[in-house]
């Protein structure tokens, strides 16, 4: 899941279950100088690379705990954007995305995702996305709904929508262009770990 990096950072590194409190000091969205490659379990999309690993990049003596927390949130959002770009390159027009589960409870992360992807983010009522997806496919397979789109409209209840802010989306576009350079630069090193 996308939020597994957030959970790892909060629980294993920061030693807290209160990730919301760790996000509170984050003030300057789109202006962080630290990047995080969120490939803690390798990467599957769009870089099919089981050797890829997580990396913090750009830290200095001025880097704070909040900067690193923000980098984790942004890194996962940038990786989601990578997949969005693949869809766009195939001619698929995407104007909004849907999120659910634990990560969807963070107002800050929802805002980051909306601005990094520069599309609307619909938050679903359901907690377990894979279970909902399985139920939707089963319902289509059994003929309850004619297709996945119809099943989604009936079963995936939207409880909140977060829209990108033009100023923040522009800042995140610049940061995303830098993020895209990191994986190709690191790829040769991953195999040597």
Where are these regions (language model features)?
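Active-site core segments that coordinate phosphate-bearing ligands/cofactors
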Residues: 1-193
């Amino acid at each position: 899941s996308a939020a597994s990096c957030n959970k790892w950072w909060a629980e294993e590194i920061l030693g807290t279950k209160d990730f919301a409190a760790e996000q509170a000091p984050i003030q300057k969205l789109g202006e962080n100088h630290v990047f995080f490659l969120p490939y803690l379990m390798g990467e599957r999309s769009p870089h099919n690379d089981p050797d890829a690993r997580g990396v913090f990049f750009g830290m200095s003596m001025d880097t704070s705990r909040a900067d690193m927390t923000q980098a984790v949130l942004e890194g996962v959002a940038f990786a989601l954007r990578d997949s969005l770009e693949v869809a766009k390159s195939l001619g698929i027009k995407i104007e909004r995305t849907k999120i659910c589960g634990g990560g969807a409870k963070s107002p800050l992360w929802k805002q980051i995702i909306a601005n990094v992807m520069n599309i609307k983010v619909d938050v679903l009522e359901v907690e377990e996305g894979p279970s909902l997806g399985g139920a939707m496919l089963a319902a289509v397979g059994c003929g309850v709904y004619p297709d996945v789109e119809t099943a989604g409209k009936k079963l995936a209840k939207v409880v909140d929508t977060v829209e990108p802010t033009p100023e923040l989306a522009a800042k995140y576009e610049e940061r995303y262009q830098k993020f895209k350079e990191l994986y190709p630069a690191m790829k040769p090193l991953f195999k040597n770990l």
